[in-house]
Amino acid sequence: METLTLNPRHARLTVTPAPDARNSLVLWHQTVSPLKVLRNGALILLARHSPSLAFKRWLYRCIGMKVGTHASLAWQVTPDLFFPELIEVGENSIIGYNTTILAHEYLLHEWRIGPVKIGRDVTIGANCTLLPGIVIGDGAMISAMSLVNKDVPPGARVGGVPVRTLVPNQLFS
């Protein structure tokens, strides 16, 4: 008999089954107000194109994100449109160009919602995707184009699709 190891991120997710045969994304408006999505979309679009890091932090805080002092979200970073209030970015962390931070995921027969916690002094390379429910520990480094589908321990050096521990000469080379 095979034993499955549950990814700790799954314990932090709220899972809701789709009520009928339609895919869960069709029902998005039942999970979040369309007016909230319009407001968040406008502010996220403005933040994605702003060159000012201080202005970006302010805009992201306006939509409910917790953004630490001196956290730097690069050009085109996209936080979750529906639930940005579930995202926390620690002080002095860097999130690279065109990274997507998701606090929700719609699947065929269910949707999942969960917090994303990025610790202090974290470096996330360009074009990464962070899935809902993950925790990235203080001082961790994530290489570009990585899929973060599980927790990253403090100080870890990870990368890939999905993320895995990297040896020192693999990171950011």
Give names to the regions the model predicted.
Residues 66-67, 71-166:
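Structural signal for interior beta-strand "rungs" in well-ordered beta-sheet cores
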